[in-house]
UniProtKB/Swiss-Prot annotation:
SUPFAM superfamilies: L30e-like. This is Large ribosomal subunit protein eL30. The lineage of its organism: Archaea, Methanobacteriati, Methanobacteriota, Thermococci, Thermococcales. One of its GO terms (molecular function) is RNA binding. The keyword Isomerase does not apply. It comes from Pyrococcus furiosus (strain ATCC 43587 / DSM 3638 / JCM 8422 / Vc1).
Length: 99
């Protein structure tokens, strides 16, 4: 699966929330179907995301690139340390959670 293609498709046809604060909030409330975290995200943020995602039974995928690369992949002119997939739309992005 082409992660870049599926992420962009999810952004166009579904609902994707960017940012660590919003991702942690959605992990706490169980409002996400998948969370993606950049490999170089700050440890405190990663720890919070993994902790709350586990409590809410939300899969977390660690993106192999940096937050700069994740932001670029999404077509954003800023870094993205984490994001939450609320609605995948027409994408098959949730398949990466099964790996």
């Amino acid at each position: 699966m082409d992660l870049a293609f599926e992420l962009r498709k999810a952004m166009e046809t579904g609902k994707v929330v960017l940012g660590s604060n919003e991702t942690i909030r959605l992990a706490k409330t169980g409002g996400a179907k998948l969370i993606i975290v950049a490999k170089n995200a700050p440890k405190e943020i990663k720890d919070d995301i993994y902790y709350y995602a586990k409590l809410s039974d939300i899969p977390v995928y660690e993106f192999e690139g940096t937050s700069v690369e994740l932001g670029t992949l999404l077509g954003k002119p800023f870094v993205v340390a984490s994001l939450a997939i609320v609605d995948p739309g027409e994408s098959k992005i949730l398949a990466i959670a099964k790996r």
